[in-house]
Amino acid sequence: MGDESNTLRVLVATDCHLGYMEKDEIRRFDSFEAFEEICSLAEQNKVDFVLLGGDLFHENKPSRSTLVKTIEILRRYCLNDQPVKFQVVSDQTINFPNRFGQVNYEDPNFNVGLPVFTIHGNHDDPAGVDNLSAIDILSACNLVNYFGKMDLGGSGVGEIAVYPVLVKKGTTFVALYGLGNIRDERLNRMFQTPHAVQWMRPETQDGMSVSDWFNILVLHQNRIKTNPKSAINEHFLPRFLDFIVWGHEHECLIDPQEVPGMGFHITQPGSSVATSLIDGEAKPKHVLLLEIKGNQYRPTKIPLRSVRPFHYAEVVLKDEVDVDPNDQASVLEHLDKIVRNLIKKSSQPTASRPETKLPLIRIKVDYSGFSTINPQRFGQKYVGKVANPQDILIFSKSAKKRQTTGVGNIDDSEKLRPEELNQQTIEALVAENNLKMEILPVDDLDIALHDFVSKDDKMAFYACLQRNLEETRTKLNSEADKFKIEEEDIIVKVGECMQERVKERSLRSKEDSRFTSSSQNLDTGGRSVTAQSNLNSFSDDEDTREMLLGARTTNAGRKASGFTRPSKDATDVAKTGTSRRGRGRGTASMKQTTLNFSQSRSSAAIRSEEVQSSSDEENETNEANEVVESSEPEESPQQTGRKRAAPRGGRGRGRGATAKRGRKADISSIQSMLMSKDDDDDDEDDRPKKPPPRVTRNYGAVRRR
């Protein structure tokens, strides 16, 4: 564009997914090589700063190796003596809400020659008690400028205010808006709720008008979806924007496209490393060099040379003439031929790839009318020839059955997110057990399980337990001050506490449904198949948080404690009093379970910090059994000869006669968790010493045979 002093040069990239496949011997360095090339291109083109659109890391808690490699790359390319030729003229304490509150190159203790601005994505989003992400680590090291981190407040679905980072270079003024990833369903409702999303415009000063600013928005959300409630429509965005960088979608659509009737252009750089082997990922990878002067911009796409070659093909066996349905050897020979041709094609060096790498090969096979073959066995012959010998083939049925649902072009469902089925099965398994719990809601356990597995939060279950115990203790103590609670009423009161929490969730779910109704009315026929929403979008392959938690509700109005997670949705619950999912299932779907007696005794022992010998523990167990035996006379003598139901069969049927006979034992187990140490000692003295013959009972029913 000429006149370099007034031209702002920005290198745009998204979805680097650093650390992806870090345990794979062949592909472990792919993400780092691509990211280093991006930084190298920024240095070669002498850009003013690098703009990243989220998902810098693949894992929410990246490994030490990943963090070290990332810091090494940023330190190598960002810390130098090159002068920074632009200024940030906005309130930096608002733009960068960390302890230091300023852009990194203005720190006198660091020589930052290449500033990096980034938002968070759905993979590296803030989580935990302090609402921190892995990007906060890089920000604390003064290596990146982390912006677009929203504090969801207000009532209902929440409220956010998007403040721009105001950048000035000569006569060019750029307002850089950042919006880190927010759950799509929630952000969708927020855009349709008046005044829920406030866009702050630059103030008029020094003879400048608002129209003098070139407005850029970078966000990380679903874009192409059939179900409009699980994505963000471009028409939700304000018309004053000039240019939008769309992250999260992995298909490279680097050329800016104008949105009809909106007046702005959208670029979708896509990912720099293939994380899901689908057709969209097979397109060449690029980054965008954006040059801005005044209110004009010039885009230049730059191909990435370090990306591992990836070739994708689709085969319909019934359409192949030389394949016999009754001869598996002919099927193998035909597929071998296709794989060999793709390997040969990828082995030829090109201008964009001077060095050849082992390629990624994926063949989608429509095996309608044929029998499948073992993909692992098929790939053994290609070890050392391709980078993914274990999953070259993926089998699918004919799409005719899918087309009968009224939705065409349904492909790649099993490949976009191959782990969805397993996670849904785990969630369903917890619900199917129908275990009657007295204190812990199943929804809380689902969330704790997700955080433990996906977020590597080792304290997830402990925090869940402590939070619910604290709520139950608080409720019992408040009622004990007003009314005298007898020993026999404790278990009833515990159940009432549980039901009250369930009822609160239900009420907030109904309240939240009011915000959903507007979005349902706007749905104009694109929601015939919900599964289609995962197919038309080439977004990252592990967007599991929305799936697992999409239909769940959380404890609304929980008392804040040291283990409460104020991350995105959890913060919303504490501040807005609404459910974090907005589609709570109410009390009808709440499943609870009975506390395991032995676990309850162990929890009581840990809480009271008593050190007991093994003989004392054995005596306590015997006394517990004796309480059960002493409760037998509550039944009429005519029932002594009646056959008892097996422990398995009694599960999930309410209390009945069995619960009545074991009532005092349940009281003792729960009282040991909720009451003080002194009360436990008094109960031990009051228990009978010589009970009738012992009867074996099952108190937990947590094992399914």
Swiss-Prot record:
Its cofactor is Mn(2+). Residues 515-538, 589-605 have a biased composition (Polar residues). Residues 641-663 have a biased composition (Basic residues). The keyword Ribosomal protein does not apply. Transmembrane segments: none annotated. Binds 2 manganese ions per subunit. It comes from the Eukaryota. It is found in: Nucleus; Chromosome. Keywords: Chromosome, DNA damage, DNA repair, Endonuclease, Exonuclease, Hydrolase, Manganese, Meiosis, Metal-binding, Nuclease, Nucleus. Residues 505-705 are annotated as: Disordered. InterPro entries: Calcineurin-like_PHP_ApaH (IPR004843), Metallo-depent_PP-like (IPR029052), Mre11 (IPR003701), Mre11_capping_dom (IPR038487), Mre11_DNA-bd (IPR007281), Mre11_N (IPR041796). Residues 505-514 have a biased composition (Basic and acidic residues). The active site is at H123. GO terms for cellular component: Mre11 complex; site of double-strand break. Core component of the MRN complex, which plays a central role in double-strand break (DSB) repair, DNA recombination, maintenance of telomere integrity and meiosis. The MRN complex is involved in the repair of DNA double-strand breaks (DSBs) via homologous recombination (HR), an error-free mechanism which primarily occurs during S and G2 phases. The complex (1) mediates the end resection of damaged DNA, which generates proper single-stranded DNA, a key initial steps in HR, and is (2) required for the recruitment of other repair factors and efficient activation of ATM and ATR upon DNA damage. This is Double-strand break repair protein MRE11. It comes from Oryza sativa subsp. indica (Rice).
